[in-house]
Amino acid sequence: MDLNLREAIMHNVANNTKEQLEHTIEDAIQRGEEKYLPGLGVLFEAIWTHANEQQKDMMLTTLEQAVKQ
């Protein structure tokens, strides 16, 4: 069986609303379990690949501040 994790995760959220996506992200973060990290990574990858340079710069600034805390 050839399991493509990225495809599976994207398939599972393909028809989700903005609110459902937010709930998925918030729930994964609140649970704090490492098993959710790949899914969050795939979602971040989707955000990153669809962001323009200004949006990427804003994300990087936010990330830089967050990791310094």
Curated annotation (Swiss-Prot):
A Pfam family it matches: SSPI
Family designation: Belongs to the SspI family.
Keywords from the named record: Sporulation
Species per Swiss-Prot/TrEMBL record: Geobacillus kaustophilus (strain HTA426)
Location in or out of the cell: Spore core
Induction: Expressed only in the forespore compartment of sporulating cells.
Superkingdom per UniProt: Bacteria
Name of the featured protein: Small, acid-soluble spore protein I
InterPro entries listed in its UniProt record: SspI
NCBIfam families found in the cross-reference section: SASP_sspI
GO biological process terms, semicolon-separated: asexual sporulation; sporulation resulting in formation of a cellular spore
